[in-house]
Swiss-Prot record:
Keyword Metal-binding: no
Record's protein name: Small ribosomal subunit protein uS3m
Pfam family, one: MRP-S24
Domain of life: Eukaryota
Species name: Drosophila melanogaster (Fruit fly)
Gene Ontology molecular function terms on file: structural constituent of ribosome
Cellular localization per UniProt: Mitochondrion
Any one GO BP annotation for this protein: mitochondrial translation
Subunit structure: Component of the mitochondrial ribosome small subunit (28S) which comprises a 12S rRNA and about 30 distinct proteins.
InterPro entries on file: Ribosomal_uS3m
Family statement: Belongs to the universal ribosomal protein uS3 family.
Amino acid sequence: MNFLKKLLPQVATEVQQLSRSGFHTSSVCCRVQSGRYRITTKRNRPLTYEMANPPHFIGHRKSWNSWNTSTMKDALRPSQTAIEDVFIRKFVTGTWHALVCSEVIIKRQHNTIRIAALIRQAITPRKMYFLIGYTEELLSYWMQCPVTLELQTVGDKKDVVFKYI
């Protein structure tokens, strides 16, 4: 009992120190937000319509960037699908260098993959048809399923901008 009486003040001071160091009251920690773009001082960051809507509007005003059912409970290949989606996005933005104006949307239906994006009209139609065939053929070979591109063209990248923040 004597031992506990001597130990109690030491434990109390340790608890007080730990409780003080665990709470952050700085303004830096309060400004952290996920899924929203931070406003710049000059308000020169362009946002598309899809980027301007916050994440809680998915299903109301905006949609998912990847449509697949393999990430559901007891699905066969959730991790492979996510890695394939990242690869497809990087491949499309690299192949269509500086031409993709929006986010790449991937839709998986049964055995087919449909890829949608907005492309700038900065190249000739002949080159555009070549890039469409090149992208579809290589992705079909690598993914072992039919891949189709659903592209829409815009005259300028500024046509896609919804607002500046």
